[in-house]
Amino acid sequence: MTVGCVSTVTRYYLPDANNPRFDTDRAAQMLDQYLRVQCPERLAAKKSESGESRLTITTDTSGAVTRAELVSSTGDEMLDGMFGAVAAQLEVDSLRATARPTATRQLRVGFSCAPDAAVATLQVLP
């Protein structure tokens, strides 16, 4: 007889009331600043120059994210953590829950590192 075990780790992020809320443009700017510090180290260590993660975000009736859950990783725990933390601080009017107290959407966060540039992208998926 063979017995197997499967375990799953769910990583989610909650907003911090002590930190500001961001729209998607401001969130991308914040991540760009972070990547400008991280990218030279990534490139020197021969780590991936680009990638993306996907998160499921839950918003309230104001469009503020109340929870961001990592569903697809970049493969880098530090980047995933930063993307999750910033996603949890989003507040976007077009993401307001209207029919119920909360709404759930998918968010794609990408990054690209080059010797002289670092870019983050955020896209709320339909």
Q: What residue spans do the PLM features occupy?
A:
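C-terminal motif of bacterial Sec signal peptides marking the signal peptidase cleavage site
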Residues: 2-4
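Conserved "boundary/linchpin" sites in short secondary-structure elements
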Residues: 6-40, 60-72, 84-94, 101-126
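Short, small/polar residue-rich loop motifs at catalytic or cofactor-binding pockets
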Residues: 47-54
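Short loop/turn segments at connectors of secondary-structure elements within structured domains
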Residues: 49, 64-66, 79
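Short helix-terminating capping/connector loops at secondary-structure junctions
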Residues: 48, 99-102
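A short acidic/small-residue loop/turn micro-motif
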Residues: 72-78
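Long, charged low-complexity terminal regions
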Residues: 42-44
